[in-house]
Amino acid sequence: MLTEELLQDIFELADLMSNGDRELFLQLRDVVFASDPNQILNSIERILEPDSFDDFLDRVGESEKENLWLILIKLLEHFDYICVRDYKDNLEDFIYFFDRLHQVRNSGISLKLDSDGLNPAASISEWARVIDSKYLYEHFCLGAVDIDTDSYYLFFSKQATFARLQELAGNLGY
């Protein structure tokens, strides 16, 4: 059962991760408060790309809380607040998708223009450490959402926002 506190935390997470994106909020609200499961699926199918929708269907389970978390993550991905990268990603693709994140673009950062320290032979976790150190004094960090896959669900945020995101995710059991 979804509690009022859980819903508040989900909506605050959405607000913080999307910088108050109204379209994302409205999509999340429509899905969360839909009374018919088919209406939820139809809404999600209209929003997501076919591959992302298939992945969503593969992950849907019995837990309302876990399904709501999955919906939030998929919406954030769709609106470019999260990028999903395979653990074996190459640096060129990583940079391309990182640079597309809204928070990255809004901050004026571009790894394509400033990739100093990023070793093409390294892994995503090593690139994340470089990014964190590169933007430490600007108070940004690269975060990841764990949804139990081999992929990284990455987002970029202010460090103070990241602390609140961790707290909210912890409240939800993540």
Regions found by a protein language model. Give the residues of each.
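N-terminal "domain-start" segment
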Residues: 1-103
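Generic alpha-helix signal with a bias toward terminal, lower-confidence helices
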Residues: 40, 44, 56, 60, ...
